[in-house]
Amino acid sequence: ASPTDRRYLLFNPLVKMKVTTQGEEVINLLWDVIAAKGFEKDTYFEMAARDIRALPKLEGTVHVNIALIVKFMPNYFFNPAVYPPIPRRADSQDDVFLWNQGPARGLGQIQFNDFRLVFEGFDQPNVKLFAEQISVLQEFLATATPDAAQQKDVDFLLALGELFALVVYAQLILENAGIYSDDISGDLLDQIFDCLVRDFSKGALTLYGKSSSTEAQMALCLRMLRKPTVDAGRFGRVWEQVQALRDAYELAW
């Protein structure tokens, strides 16, 4: 980060919004498995199920952070810049800019690398499917641009912001897949994008159903719907990696 590279002003609210809401979703999915045991007292899960609800309302106030990130959309999708690759940083160095960031205004002027370039380096089926979904979202923004009323409609912006958040996360995941290539297998990456494709389709359907969506917008939302590529072998290999971590962590009270 620097005065000429302020991309972090998108990534920070994105993390606050998306990580906190996904934390809730993880707890909900675990609760479906744990069922009644999730109500037992004096367990970690009983505490987690209660406290996880606070994060999206406190640290990651969702509607506030989505209102922030949508300001970046025009430049992100249609006005890219060129920045040098950022390597993995694990060195001991004083990050002077952290304490001298300056004002946070001018969010709409911040530019980003062309996200499409990083997608070109991967050939996993679900990565390609997700790239197709993004292309339709770009068409949505260019040809069925939300009107002035929709841009003030928080409910509409929440749905659109969710789609944008998935695109940014996908770009960051792929960039880091290159940096941590020894730790991230092609199977794992494809399985991650299996989730992203489904989440994007869910978000597109939500946007389709908004009361203010137009016929043109609805048609484009339907074109965003995709089913991820099914690969039982890939799923099994990823499951074996996860299953091997069982009992690797023990909570100390």
How would you name each of these model-derived features?
Residues 1-253:
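Flavin-dependent oxidoreductase catalytic core characteristic
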